[in-house]
A protein has these predicted regions:
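Short, conserved phosphate-binding/catalytic loop or strand-edge motifs used
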Residues: 115-119, 123
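C-terminal accessory/tail domains of diverse enzymes
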Residues: 1-113, 126-229
């Protein structure tokens, strides 16, 4: 079996985790309490809150309009501030426990998820090659059913925001020669129409999303799933 040219423990990653049940200010203060630091409300279009951990890495709490807001307590009035998305900084494998503690702190603060909530995992692939990306797509395709079942992906998301690998495109990518360039891979991914600068290109709604993989390092793969806090 051919192995990828790098150990996943050597790869950087980051997460976007969507939740509700608490407002953005409460979520930010939960992180600040965990780290023993302060919050900064920078606002803007995403109503961002910033919190640094003890390593100086910045975590963000932002608005995500796709979330269906709710509260655990009926007596609490909810509003747009209850649409919460956590953006982690660039993390190393050894910081997985830190991420877990962050999620636990949000849960203790009252954070919950519903069918509108999901999780994106961004994986650094600056060391990947066109061949290794081909391998990743093939592996994802062969294991998708198992992954979707294990992660309990919402069936509605499989038809919309978390679609399976596009088989015709995968077959075209597989046919590329071993020495294929990143530009050739990009051409197959976008079917001859460069959509790399279009943020909402249809390929972003695949479980394995390679848009930034074939544009510039660091490469990001997005795996979208329903995630319980």
């Amino acid at each position: 079996m051919r192995r990828l040219p790098l150990d996943f423990r050597d790869q950087y990653f980051g997460c976007e985790i969507k939740l509700t049940g608490i407002n953005r200010a409460t979520a930010a203060h939960a992180l600040a309490d965990l780290f023993g630091t302060c919050t900064e409300h920078s606002g803007g279009g995403y109503d961002a809150y910033r919190v640094k951990d003890l390593d100086g890495k910045e975590w963000k709490i932002v608005r995500d309009s796709s979330i269906h807001l709710e509260s655990r307590r009926r007596s609490v009035l909810t509003g747009e501030t209850y649409k919460v998305e956590l953006n982690s900084p660039k993390l190393e494998y050894g910081e997985m426990e830190k991420l877990q503690e962050v999620v636990r702190s949000l849960r203790r603060a009252g954070g919950i998820v519903n069918d509108s909530c999901g999780m994106h995992v961004h994986v650094d692939a600056s060391k990947h090659t066109p061949q290794s990306l081909k391998n990743v797509l093939s592996i994802m395709y062969s294991k998708e059913d198992i992954l979707f079942a294990a992660l309990k992906v919402n069936p509605a998301r499989i038809d919309s925001y978390c679609q399976a690998v596009d088989e015709p495109i995968l077959e075209e990518i597989r046919k590329l020669p071993s020495g294929a360039s990143m530009d050739q891979l990009k051409d197959r991914w976008y079917q001859g129409r460069d959509g790399s600068d279009y943020h909402y290109h249809s390929s972003r709604y695949r479980a394995c999303y390679g848009k930034k993989a074939i544009m510039y390092p660091p490469f990001q793969t997005l795996i979208v799933q329903r995630q319980k806090l």
